[in-house]
């Protein structure tokens, strides 16, 4: 017939082309179409997905990189007690009762404390010293009065100020280590470095940082139809958009793209390029040549690169069915479909997770989330206010806790997951309200929430959880705050160290229905002072305390109300209020810093912190640092991992090395 005659003529003229047409029409089918989960399992089974080796980079080159190791703060930030406002350093007791009608007058000392200049004069009773924002708090002062709340008065004895509003102890004072405490784990390995982390590193004076090496990802495009960008488009040609898209996606995923360019459907040329890419890079990504149609060579070339070779060729995915996944020389190789939509879809499903794993990055999160606000947040009328919040998982969904480190804090943004807005016409956001939280960067909801007292040994436990892929959120709100959070079901665990009312035992009185007690470790609380202080050297803690109370010039540094250490201090003092009692920082580090820097003469802190600051230490009493467990959360994987870490010999050895004693020893 006519068709047979045409085909016969065709065979005589172009026998090679006829064979090609027959092969194309026949089309070898996919080896096996598998489910997405099975494809991922086969692929990952032959890969080492641990982060790549570390490299050291300058701080200026650290943006977007990933910490390869925990960063421990080498200094306190701030390194000294400092003023948060322009005003006058005072003794808070001297301002009691001050008002517009009955101001309190204080004589001005002959000193102006500017930033960068240590104070010289001590603030005595009924005196004040002019101080700038950021200036060091002088000895004797425990608060700062804003200049706006004062009036300069000339008297026969010299200049003085009338104070029209009282200030509480600690008012407008940023304590040493209140932002960053020396020796604490400041930033953890696996965290992506953004501008917030850069600021924290710079605040600690760190010029270099160890980061995970970015995986080098070779990007190749294949096909006779591809045209270079910028060149005229020829008939039947298309621009190589896949190369540009995939290279950008590699960068977004945390990799370093290496553009090898676009290659024609020439098997020998393409094979040479792929082998060169495999030798030079950590991963190879090709686009095109997966469908086993005419001219599709990529999958055949990949199959020749070595064992185990092609693991998947065909995935039950739309779009993206022609995907090819392979491994050679322990390196991942992927051949993405040629159509851009299919290529980028399969890239984000299969390639991006591998790149992020090699780069040490976590999984991306969404952009906004609705969360309940558990506490009332006051706001100034007439101004829209943005409040930084930390997100934790509550019983009825996300809970947004406002961060409270203040405008001078370096870590406020780093420890926040997002922010919420309070309308200009609202005086507050009431407790219990839901708010829309705008997430900052790549936010991951924590797997474990710990709220209460902080201890450096806790970092050893959380480090083990981080190794297992769990993200923990810790909020240092004191033992009493932890008890409240546990009762409201806002945390998984609450670290506490509180004596019962009779002073006989630690923490057992906090157990109640729904809340169990998990033993932690024991740490020694003691009397800390500077080496060489003859008032305390060679004495017992009781003798040293008696000597301190007998000397009116001997300044103490206290702890904040609600802290377990504060309860111990008040028991030791028996109702007395020695000089410095109103100085109430919120951490052991701040206490040690005050003593070490001569702003106080003694305080109560734990032994490891005393050693860290080079202070003498007189033991007072062992303290039980335990955990309240919200029993409804006990079976959560992260909680079980935490409980297992407490029993882990390596973790226990680390705790012991820090000067603590595990509870059952």
Report residues per predicted region.
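Short, glycine/charged-enriched hinge/interface segments at domain edges or termini
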Residues: 16-34, 70, 89-264, 396-405, ...
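Short loop->beta-strand "edge-of-pocket" segments that line small-molecule binding or catalytic clefts
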Residues: 445-454, 542-566
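N-terminal segment of the mature folded domain
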Residues: 465-540
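Short, low-complexity N-terminal leaders and the immediately following helix N-cap/first helix
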Residues: 2-100, 106, 130, 142, ...
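Helix-rich terminal scaffold detector
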Residues: 3-37, 207-336, 340-346, 460-468, ...
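A ligand-binding cleft/hinge motif common to bilobed small-molecule-binding domains
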Residues: 495-511, 592-621
């Amino acid at each position: 017939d006519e068709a047979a005659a045409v085909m016969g003529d065709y065979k005589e003229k172009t026998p090679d082309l006829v064979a090609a047409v027959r092969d194309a029409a026949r089309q070898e089918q996919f080896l096996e179409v598998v489910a997405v989960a099975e494809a991922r399992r086969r692929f990952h089974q032959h890969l080492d997905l641990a982060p790549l080796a570390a490299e050291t980079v300058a701080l200026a080159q650290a943006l977007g990189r990933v910490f390869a190791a925990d960063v421990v703060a080498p200094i306190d930030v701030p390194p000294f007690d400092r003023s948060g406002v322009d005003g006058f350093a005072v003794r808070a007791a001297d301002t009691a009762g001050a008002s517009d009608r009955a101001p309190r007058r204080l004589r001005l000392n002959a000193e102006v404390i500017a930033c960068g200049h240590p104070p010289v004069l001590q603030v005595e009773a009924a005196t004040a010293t002019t101080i700038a924002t950021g200036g060091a708090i002088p000895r004797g002062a425990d608060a700062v009065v804003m200049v706006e709340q004062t009036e300069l008065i000339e008297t026969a004895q010299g200049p003085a100020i009338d104070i029209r509003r009282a200030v509480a102890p600690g008012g407008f004072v940023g304590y040493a280590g209140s932002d960053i405490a020396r020796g604490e784990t400041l930033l953890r390995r696996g965290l992506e470095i953004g501008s917030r982390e850069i600021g924290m590193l710079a605040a600690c004076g760190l010029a270099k940082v160890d980061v995970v090496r970015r995986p080098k990802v070779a990007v190749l495009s294949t096909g006779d139809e591809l045209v270079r960008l910028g060149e005229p488009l020829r008939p039947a040609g298309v621009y190589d958009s896949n190369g540009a898209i995939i290279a950008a996606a590699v960068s977004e995923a945390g990799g370093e793209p290496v553009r090898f360019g676009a290659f024609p459907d020439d098997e020998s040329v393409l094979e040479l390029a792929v082998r060169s890419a495999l030798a030079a890079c950590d991963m190879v990504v090709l686009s095109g040549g997966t469908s086993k149609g005419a001219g599709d060579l990529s999958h055949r070339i990949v199959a020749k690169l070595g064992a185990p070779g092609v693991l998947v060729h065909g995935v039950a995915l739309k779009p993206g069915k022609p995907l090819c996944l392979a491994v050679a020389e322990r390196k991942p190789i992927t051949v993405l479909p040629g159509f851009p939509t299919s290529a980028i879809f399969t890239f984000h499903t299969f390639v991006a997770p591998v790149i992020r794993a090699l780069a040490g990055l976590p999984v991306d999160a969404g952009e906004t989330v609705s969360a309940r606000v558990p506490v009332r947040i006051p706001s100034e009328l007439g101004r829209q206010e943005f409040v930084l919040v930390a997100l934790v998982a509550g019983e009825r969904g996300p809970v947004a806790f406002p961060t409270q480190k203040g405008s001078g804090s370096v870590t406020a943004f780093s420890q926040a997951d997002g922010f919420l807005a309070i309308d200009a016409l609202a005086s507050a956001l009431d407790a219990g309200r839901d708010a829309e939280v705008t997430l900052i960067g790549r936010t991951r909801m924590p797997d474990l929430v710990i709220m209460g007292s902080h201890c450096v040994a806790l970092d050893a436990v959380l480090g083990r959880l981080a190794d297992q892929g769990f993200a923990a959120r810790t909020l240092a709100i004191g033992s009493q705050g932890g008890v409240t959070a546990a009762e409201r079901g806002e945390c998984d665990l609450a670290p506490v160290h509180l004596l019962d009312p009779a002073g006989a035992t630690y923490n057992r009185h906090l157990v109640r229905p729904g809340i169990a007690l998990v033993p932690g470790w024991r740490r020694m609380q003691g009397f800390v002072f500077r080496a060489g202080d003859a008032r305390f050297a060679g004495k017992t803690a009781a003798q040293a305390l008696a000597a301190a109370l007998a000397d009116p010039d001997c300044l103490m540094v206290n702890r904040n109300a609600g802290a377990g250490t504060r309860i111990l201090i008040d028991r030791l003092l028996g109702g007395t209020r020695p000089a410095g009692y109103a100085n109430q920082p919120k951490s052991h580090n701040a206490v040690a810093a005050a003593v070490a820097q001569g702003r106080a003469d003694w305080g109560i802190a734990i032994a490891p912190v005393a050693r860290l600051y080079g202070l003498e230490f007189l033991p007072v009493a062992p303290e039980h640092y335990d955990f309240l467990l919200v029993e409804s959360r006990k079976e959560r994987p992260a909680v079980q991992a935490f409980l297992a870490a407490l029993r882990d010999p390596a973790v226990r050895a680390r705790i012991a090395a820090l000067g603590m004693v595990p509870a059952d020893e």
